[in-house]
């Protein structure tokens, strides 16, 4: 396996591990209400939320990445989503460009899968080089227990999530491998983010700042702080991801990642199931 293929595989594995633990954190009542669960099928990680119509929560990560896939593997993944959603679930199967075999995308297309407008995610990875110091007029630090609810609400609002998901976000900050962060303006929570630490691997996610407080360095400083904390925790591989720009649209998230020392492991295709 080439170094680039190994980086792409690592970025998928780290993301998958973070989301498996994220799903495990869901309050039982909410998990039952939304049908939240994960499964491993054909060495891929499957995320299910059949009563939450958003592809970010219904997708397959890593098919053909950790071992070569065959058409029976692909059909098993499709069948699992079909069973979960009674044939109507909108979901994605991610196609890593280093997945095997090379014609995985052709198999998907022959089964009616298509690429949405945002065709790819930039899978980003970095090592232990210190991040830059990014000046900000906001306060950025670890979230205190009394701030966790406000941080979760701010994150949910920034990502357009339903209010019912706020307790789910809150729940991850009480788990051993998760750390929560707050962005504040004059003592008020206006943003936040999460760091998942899994041995020598780390994942950054849920980073957000309320619209009216953007362009003040908060997002960059939040990313840099989480990177420093991951390195201090002994992590040697730090992963994150973002949707790649469509046409010439700006992508401040991607710009901040590059600024903070992330390199692109790969551009991963998002194949939407037929009818999405």
Segments the model singles out, each with a brief description of its role:
Residues 70-78, 206-209, 215-232, 255, ...:
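Conserved acetyl-CoA-binding loop-helix of GNAT-fold acetyltransferases
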Residues 1-82, 100:
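N-terminal charged segments
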Residues 1-26, 61, 67, 118-167:
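Short amphipathic alpha-helix that is part of the acyltransferase structural core
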Residues 86, 178, 233-235:
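Short, high-confidence coil segments that cap the C-terminus of an alpha-helix
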Residues 68-139, 143-144, 240, 246, ...:
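Acyl-donor-binding surface of acyltransferase catalytic domains
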Residues 37-42, 100-114, 177-191:
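Conserved beta-hairpin
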Residues 160-212:
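A conserved beta-strand-loop-helix scaffold within acyl/acetyltransferase catalytic domains
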Residues 51-66, 200-211, 270:
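Conserved acetyl-CoA binding element of GNAT-fold acetyltransferases
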């Amino acid at each position: 396996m080439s170094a680039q293929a190994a980086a792409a595989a690592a970025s998928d594995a780290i993301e998958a591990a973070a989301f498996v633990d994220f799903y495990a954190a869901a309050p039982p009542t909410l998990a039952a209400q939304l049908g939240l669960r994960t499964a491993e099928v054909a060495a891929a990680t499957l995320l299910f939320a059949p009563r939450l119509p958003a592809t970010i929560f219904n997708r397959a990560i890593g098919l053909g990445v950790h071992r070569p896939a065959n058409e029976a593997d692909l059909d098993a993944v499709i069948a699992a989503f079909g069973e979960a959603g009674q044939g109507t679930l909108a979901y994605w199967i991610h196609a890593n460009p280093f997945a095997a075999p090379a014609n995985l995308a052709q198999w998907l297309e022959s089964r009616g899968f298509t690429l949405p407008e945002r065709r790819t995610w930039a899978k980003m990875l970095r090592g232990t080089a210190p991040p830059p110091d990014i000046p900000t007029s906001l306060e950025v630090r670890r979230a205190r227990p009394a701030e966790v609810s406000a941080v979760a609400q701010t994150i949910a609002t920034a990502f357009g999530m339903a209010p019912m998901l706020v307790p789910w976000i809150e729940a991850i900050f009480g788990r051993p491998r998760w750390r929560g962060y707050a962005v504040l303006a004059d003592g008020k929570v206006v943003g936040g983010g999460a760091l998942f630490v899994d041995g020598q691997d780390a994942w950054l996610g849920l980073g957000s700042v309320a619209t009216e407080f953007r362009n003040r360095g908060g997002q960059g400083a939040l990313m840099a702080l989480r990177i420093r904390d991951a390195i201090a925790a002994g992590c040697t591989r730090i992963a994150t991801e973002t949707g790649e720009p469509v046409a010439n649209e700006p992508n401040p998230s991607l710009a901040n990642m590059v600024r903070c020392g992330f390199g692109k492991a790969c551009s991963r295709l998002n194949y939407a199931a037929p009818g999405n």
